[in-house]
Amino acid sequence: MLSHPQHTGPSPALPTPPAAGADSRVFRDVVELGRVLREDLAEVAGTGRLPARAALLVDWDSRWAVLRDSLPSSLLDVHDEALGWYRAFLEAGVRVDVLPTDADREGYGLVVAPLLHVLPGATARRLTGYAEGGGHLVATYFSGIVDENDHVHLGGYPGPLRDLLGLRIEEFAPLREGERVALDDGSSGTLWSDRITVTAPETEVWARYADGPLAGGAALTHRPLPGGGSAAYVSTRLDGEHRTALLGRLLAGAGIGSELPEDLRGRVELAVRAGAEYHFLANRTGEPVKLHHLPGTPLSGTTEEGEDARVLAPRGVSVWRVPPRDPAG
């Protein structure tokens, strides 16, 4: 018989068990949610999600493949890398759609494809066509290593993305746990680094390694493409604030801005439903957030504070009806 592990410290805070019945916080919260959906948000029913202008590709084949013990690093984690980029989008106040690698990319101005270790030829061709057609693609370290049959791509890395990115990886230089590498733009990275040879004259080196055996070598690259698109490569796992700063530069190049006022970016997450257009605002912080001069009408989730402000509670969610945007704008 399995025994339960013994806790040596304070008991963790756990959700109320279902058997607690109607006299419990969870039950009351669920009842209140039902009331809000029925009374306050009935008009939202039937609306569709409005796609974002940026996409984040998450590949489950790569997720499982990098868990093997025969790779250069045991610290690789597709989920963590993707989550880091998702957080960067939240900090920038920009909506992003999380998609599988075979999803349609039409309508997306920027596509981030982190740690695509498994890169079938068909996926590589779609990514190349997307960037050459005017889209802005971001690839990261240890991508394009094997195909869908786990056969190594010959000719150098990152496999079929070499020509698009305008570079070749000479050597992998994984970092030990806790080890850091500095870049000459003031940023730093962990987990991984590459020795890169730039092969296309138009490929720009945005940052170089500032210390260690790779000092002076390219770390962040960006290749403008004739069709107006671009292909960027990130060869290390950037720290949070530095990843957010890089993403801001990439978003600006793709012509994508935030739909949130500047004071809400990083604090409030936005989701948008089409139709009359509804904005769902989720407070990511443990503090109340003031919503000043937002367009539209609040339907739920806020309290008034003065004539021109409403307050969104800590971890709270508010829904607003806003005028439909001009499709041409």
Residue ranges of each PLM-predicted region?
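Carbohydrate-binding surfaces of carbohydrate-active enzymes
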Residues: 1-329
